[in-house]
Design a protein with these regions (language model features):
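Cysteine endopeptidase catalytic domains of the caspase/legumain-like
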Residues: 1-235
């Protein structure tokens, strides 16, 4: 992702974020059979673009109570210094105007606007004050802040690439984020025949092993709506 419009230098750009999204889209089409016209990929998305596409996704959900929604994001995250609430940072947003970004609590609320069979969130980002790049968007004085994360609602399941006090790294050899690379590899190896619990467990173990080798360990996280019983077995 290119954050140059915020006035920041190129070091805070997120390497391979667009590549992550394009490859994830390919697997949604080829492995899960998602119709091509029902997928939107938005490279270098501004806040306005992200809100617009979220509205499109919610409107799609309004047409079918058996709909399954997928939201994937690769890029920067951070948390509000005052509230500790985590946000996704579109390319025109920095830590200084973070509340104009996409808060995770608002994202979960939007995805639960209408009854759906399932809403699945995949986040290759971190919210600790560390970033998927060579430099931070805001000086944190070396302190990583654990964000205050709201729970998903309705039939919503959220996978994220690292725990609240960790950074998410990029896999330069593969030109992807570590989390996205192993997420897609796990889906590919299982030929799409895998439960959500198995997908999380296998991806998490692979990411943890690979990032331990570079001494930047990531422990992916899974959060499910407390009212969604049986999500573990969904394929």
């Amino acid at each position: 992702e290119d954050y140059s419009m915020t006035g920041a230098n190129a070091e805070i750009n997120v390497p391979y974020a667009v590549n992550d999204a394009v490859l994830f889209r390919e697997y949604c089409v080829r492995t899960f059979g998602v119709p091509d016209g029902q997928i939107k990929v938005v490279p270098n998305a501004t806040a306005g673009m992200m809100h617009e596409q979220l509205d499109w996704l919610v409107n799609m959900a309004s047409t079918d109570p058996q709909a399954e929604l997928i939201f994937y994001y690769s890029g920067h995250g951070n948390n509000d210094e005052a509230t500790k609430e985590p946000y996704l940072l579109p390319v025109d947003i920095t830590g200084k105007n973070i509340r104009l970004g996409i808060s995770l609590s608002d994202l979960y609320k939007k995805l639960a606007t209408y009854p759906v069979k399932g809403a699945y969130v995949f986040l290759d980002a971190c919210f600790s004050g560390g970033y998927k790049s060579a430099a931070p968007l805001l000086a944190q004085k070396g302190v990583r802040v654990v964000p205050k994360v709201g729970l998903p609602q309705g039939n919503t399941l959220s996978f994220s690439s690292s725990s609240g006090d960790q950074t998410s790294s990029v896999y330069h050899e593969k030109k992807q984020g570590y989390y996205t690379y192993f997420l897609i590899k796990t889906i590919r190896d299982a030929k799409g025949n895998i439960s959500m619990k198995e997908l999380f467990d296998r991806t998490s173990a692979a990411v943890k092993r690979a990032t331990a080798l570079i001494d930047k360990i990531q422990e992916p996280q899974c959060m499910a709506s407390p009212t969604w019983i049986g999500w573990e077995d969904i394929k």
